[in-house]
Amino acid sequence: MKKVHFIGIGGIGISAIARFLFEKGHKISGSDIKESKTTQELKEQGMDVITPHCKEAIKDQDFVVYSAAIKDDNVELVEARKKGIKCFSRKEILPYVLEDKRVFAVAGAHGKSTTSAMLSSLIEGSVIIGAISKQFGSNMRYAQSDNVVFEADESDSSFLNSNPYLAVVTNAEPEHMEHYDYDLAKFYAAYKGFLERAKVRVINAEDEFLSTLKLDAIRLFPSSDITELAMVVRDYQPYTSFNLKNLGKFEVFGMGQHIAIDASLAILAALHETPLKDIRENLLNFKGIKKRFDILSADKNFILIDDYAHHPTEIRATLNSVFEYAKLLGVSNVTAIFQPHRYTRLSTNLEGFKECFKGVDELVILPVYAAGEKPIEVDMKGAFSEYSPIFTDKVERVGEAIEFTDEFGVKNRLSDGIVVGFGAGDISVQLRGGY
């Protein structure tokens, strides 16, 4: 048994690893900048978690793990290094966590959380992912098994440390380019390196970069391999059915072509571990993941959806699904609430963001969630002028409605049609309120 301390333990990726090592029998402590639902849950599970960070948290731990958000001057990190305790980033600790496991690793700019969660429904084993699966209510599931379904992150190239037995790549659209010195060759080399580390590879072969690879791989061609795509709504819950290659018909929770693609990649990966009949049945156990087309409230008058999409490609894919969902329900009004996430992402992808909201009836824009970045000047009013957007500092959930005060002091209330919030910051907390 090791004593392991996690700095930034409330983060979605770090908390999953902490939970996994705790279940393996290690003594886990941790800290974060403030209390959250996650830190409370970790305490309830038996971990020693404190807030905020303080040097007294560093005692006699065997090693310390810190999240990507932690800077070198963090008081706990400084204290641990002063005491000579080994310190590892999340990226650096992965070989220790995964070294003796048969890892089913899922990477990609978009869809990796959903695909990972779907795959965790299809095969037996532990699960370490960057989202809360509604099937088991956590970002981690522990099993006495060599198998681990792992969501592999390209943002800091940590997927290269994931020891994949089987590697899935949903797509390789350039993102987090600051980590790769804005060098596309470095970025694509990392994806190629990730795939080369695996014995089995499953890829979306219609991705611009992945289509050029000469590696031995199981290839999904969505435009021809996925047929008879159909969507249906039952009790306000979305489902997608489709035929995959010569494998027959499947149904999965969620709505849209991108959901069928994610499910197809998970199915092709699971075929190495699970009989086809069981895959078809197990896929029905998937109930979606938190913050992905997450229906918070639904009745005949008002539907509120929380979605983590924070890149133009993701927002457009989700909105296409929302429009289809609205059509099936006979709803005519769709309002989008957008909280930009990181100044660098907003400025780099501004043209994409200007285009991705086409079709919405109303656009509400929140301030940029900086995530620690320094501000970059962006003319938001000019960029989004075609939408005549409403700007507000925050939104509030009030019963079955969303309320906010706009920049002119006028109070607004959204209580009919579909309202969908987009962002990776704290918009989810605003939309949920105390509900």
Curated annotation (Swiss-Prot):
Keywords from the UniProt entry: ATP-binding, Cell cycle, Cell division, Cell shape, Cell wall biogenesis/degradation, Cytoplasm, Ligase, Nucleotide-binding, Peptidoglycan synthesis
Listed Pfam families: Mur_ligase, Mur_ligase_C, Mur_ligase_M
Chief location bin: cytoplasm
Cysteines engaged in disulfide bonds, as pairs: none
InterPro entries referenced in this protein's UniProt entry, alphabetically: Mur-like_cat_sf (IPR036565), Mur_ligase_C (IPR004101), Mur_ligase_C_dom_sf (IPR036615), Mur_ligase_cen (IPR013221), Mur_ligase_N (IPR000713), MurCDEF_pg_biosynth (IPR050061), UDP-N-AcMur_Ala_ligase_MurC (IPR005758)
Binding site for ATP: G108, A109, H110, G111, K112, S113, T114
GO BP, sorted A to Z: cell division; cell wall organization; peptidoglycan biosynthetic process; regulation of cell shape
Cellular compartments annotated: Cytoplasm
Reaction catalysed by this enzyme: UDP-N-acetyl-alpha-D-muramate + L-alanine + ATP = UDP-N-acetyl-alpha-D-muramoyl-L-alanine + ADP + phosphate + H(+)
GO CC annotation terms, alphabetical: cytoplasm
Molecular functions per Gene Ontology: ATP binding; UDP-N-acetylmuramate-L-alanine ligase activity
Pathway the protein contributes to: Cell wall biogenesis; peptidoglycan biosynthesis
Purpose of the protein: Cell wall formation.
UniProt record similarity statement: Belongs to the MurCDEF family.
Protein name per its UniProtKB record: UDP-N-acetylmuramate--L-alanine ligase
Gene field: murC
